[in-house]
A protein has these predicted regions:
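Short juxtamembrane and helix-loop transition motifs at transmembrane-helix boundaries
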Residues: 1-8, 29-37, 60-65, 91-95, ...
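Alpha-helical transmembrane segments and their helix-entry boundary regions
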Residues: 39-42, 53, 68-69, 96-100, ...
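Alpha-helical transmembrane segments and their membrane-interface exit regions
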Residues: 48-51, 74-81, 167-174, 217-229
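Helix-loop-helix junctions within the multi-pass membrane cores of secondary transporters/permeases
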Residues: 70-162
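C-terminal ends of transmembrane helices
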Residues: 81-89, 114-117, 172-181, 223-231
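Membrane-embedded alpha-helical modules
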Residues: 125-214, 222, 226
């Protein structure tokens, strides 16, 4: 039985709770520099947790708009990889649907998508929209509320809330890793993880961190493909 929009919403609800906590943290951190309306516009148009945290830091440092745009672009380059992989399940979807799915795809909704792929080979367009939209609404709402509440705190940075996004990614990776153990060989996973870790560390000596993340991800994908081809 194919899953519909509301089943996509239900499947993504646990992740949406994570959006709320991280979004509140993002809003609180941004409160000294942005109004709730400005935060709402940022979340609607940018909609990228890591990029928004970076933008807030750059705003606090009075960085140029060009620098912010380039930083956001580099941070979000990884979305191209996720979108390319996800698009294989929606080849027959209309242009409007594919644009909608690609625009709202995040690390978290991609994680939910991968978890669903472990259960079924058929991912429907309505289910994917439900998966994406619940996070979008939760993120916008949480960041705006966080910005409004943050104005009541004397020093939001003292709470270390900017680490919340990292903590969420660790949780998502741990859950995804457990799922991969059911379908992938341990040797392959270890080879991929080792390739990503070593290449990322070495690349940091030559390129910026966002580029190192992207390049290490590509190297990890290449190693995974090679290992699968040999097995």
């Amino acid at each position: 039985m194919e899953k519909d929009f509301w089943q996509g919403v239900r499947d993504a609800l646990p992740t949406a709770l994570g959006y709320i906590s991280i979004g509140l943290a993002c809003g609180v951190v941004a409160s000294p520099y942005l109004s709730p309306l400005e935060m709402a516009l940022m979340s609607i148009l940018v909609y990228a947790g890591a990029a928004q945290f970076a933008m807030i830091s750059l705003i606090a440092a009075h960085s140029s708009i060009l620098n912010m745009a380039l930083t956001v672009c580099l941070i979000n380059l990884r979305n191209m990889l996720m979108s390319l992989h996800t698009s294989t399940d929606f080849k027959d979807a209309s242009l409007a649907h594919t644009i909608g799915i690609g625009s709202l795809l995040t690390d978290e909704s991609y994680g939910v998508y991968l978890s669903e792929k472990l259960k079924t080979d058929t991912i429907t367009v309505p289910w994917m929209h439900g998966n994406n939209l619940v996070g979008y609404v939760a993120w916008i709402s949480a960041t705006v509320i966080g910005t409004a509440l943050g104005s009541l705190l004397p020093d939001p940075k003292a709470f270390g809330l900017d680490f919340a996004l990292v903590a969420m990614f660790i949780g998502i990776f741990a859950a995804q890793f457990q799922g991969m153990q059911l379908t992938e060989k341990t040797k392959t996973m270890l080879m991929v993880l080792l390739a990503v870790a070593v290449s990322f560390f070495l690349l940091l000596f030559f390129v910026s961190q966002p580029l190192a993340v992207l390049a290490a991800t590509l190297i990890g994908c290449f190693v995974g493909v090679v290992c699968d081809a040999r097995e």
